[in-house]
């Protein structure tokens, strides 16, 4: 088994293609995560709460971040065997809510690689911006790459 490349921290990947946040995508995601807030299902409720359209649940940006993680996992120089990856941690830092109609682009940078015995922990930050280049949310994921058993 090839170990995770310890030189990954600081490596950035190209911006993802724009992702159009559609109302139905928000509704589908909200249903899948058992969200109950009406601002994710009802446009009028979202507008009454001061939003332009439906609001994605707090974890919705993972949909956009997954495109950046695909870049990392497909990078042969990363040394990450996807069959050995488990999700260790997830955090989001918001500037504003994700709303239907947003066109979001993400750029990922690997921030750390730590070895824990035979295992590795890879932390990456995905900066997610709107069509105007304004920051919306930063998604931070830690992947655990299991070593040999």
Swiss-Prot record:
Coiled coil: none annotated. It comes from the Bacteria. InterPro entries: FAS1-like_DH_region, HadA-like, HotDog_dom_sf. It holds the Pfam family FAS1_DH_region. Gene3D superfamilies: Hotdog Thioesterase (3.10.129.10). HAMAP family: UPF0336. Belongs to the UPF0336 family. This is UPF0336 protein Lxx02810. It comes from Leifsonia xyli subsp. xyli (strain CTCB07).
């Amino acid at each position: 088994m090839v170990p995770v490349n310890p030189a990954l921290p600081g490596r950035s990947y190209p911006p993802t293609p724009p992702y159009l946040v559609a109302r139905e995508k928000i509704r589908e995601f909200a249903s899948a995560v058992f969200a109950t807030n009406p601002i994710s299902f009802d446009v009028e409720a979202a507008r009454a709460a001061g939003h332009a359209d439906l609001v994605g649940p707090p974890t919705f940006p993972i949909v956009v971040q997954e495109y950046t993680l695909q870049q990392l996992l497909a990078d042969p120089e990363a040394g990450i065997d996807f069959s050995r990856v488990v999700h260790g941690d997830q955090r989001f830092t918001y500037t504003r809510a994700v709303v239907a109609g947003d066109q979001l682009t993400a750029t990922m940078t690997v921030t750390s690689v730590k070895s824990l015995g035979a295992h590795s922990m890879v932390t990456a930050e995905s900066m997610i911006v709107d069509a105007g280049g304004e920051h919306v949310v930063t998604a931070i994921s830690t992947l655990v790459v299991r070593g040999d058993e």
